[in-house]
């Protein structure tokens, strides 16, 4: 899901709200991410639900992507109130969750937007190794944006519930209230 206008035309930027994605089977090859919000998030993105989805393959990318579920904020939009529920992951070779605010080649707005109130519930990894998960905010000499209020409830790897950040292989930087 993207939220940007035509190149160089900010008058076409629109908010993305009240999107319900459900009962999907997803296969992701290199490059990219299976369920992705971003890059190009220049407006407000909120009240999204991803529910009852099966990610059957998410290939190793070796760069910035390769996640089963990602939010990549490279612009100034505010991403909030997003729910991921009842998602089964059969194969995630690189990352399970990848949530970050960053400056990259896709950036069109200098000021960075926020990511907050993101909820993961009943996410199951069914096969393979436990992939790493990343949550990272943004810091420059003039700006700091922290990712905050991210919840994980009932995340399991091959039937074993993740009780700690270590179980989830979660790495955080510039993030609060995880």
Q: What name fits each language-model region?
A:
Residues 1-178:
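Extracellular/periplasmic carbohydrate-active domains that bind, remodel
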């Amino acid at each position: 899901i993207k939220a940007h206008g035509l190149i160089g035309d900010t008058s076409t930027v629109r908010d993305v709200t009240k999107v319900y994605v459900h009962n999907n089977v997803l296969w992701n090859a290199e490059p990219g991410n299976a369920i992705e919000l971003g890059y190009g998030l220049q407006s407000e993105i909120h009240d999204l639900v991803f529910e009852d989805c099966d990610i059957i393959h998410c290939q190793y990318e070796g760069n910035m992507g390769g996640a089963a579920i990602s939010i990549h904020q490279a612009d100034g939009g505010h991403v909030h109130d997003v729910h991921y529920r009842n998602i089964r992951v059969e194969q995630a070779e690189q990352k399970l969750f990848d949530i970050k605010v960053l400056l990259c080649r896709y950036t069109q707005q200098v000021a960075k937007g926020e990511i907050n109130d993101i909820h993961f519930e009943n996410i199951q990894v069914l096969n393979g190794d436990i992939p790493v998960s990343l949550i990272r905010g943004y810091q420059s000499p003039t700006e700091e944006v922290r990712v905050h209020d991210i919840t994980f409830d009932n995340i399991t790897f091959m039937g074993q519930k993740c009780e700690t950040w270590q179980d989830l292989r979660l790495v955080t930087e510039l993030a609060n209230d995880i």
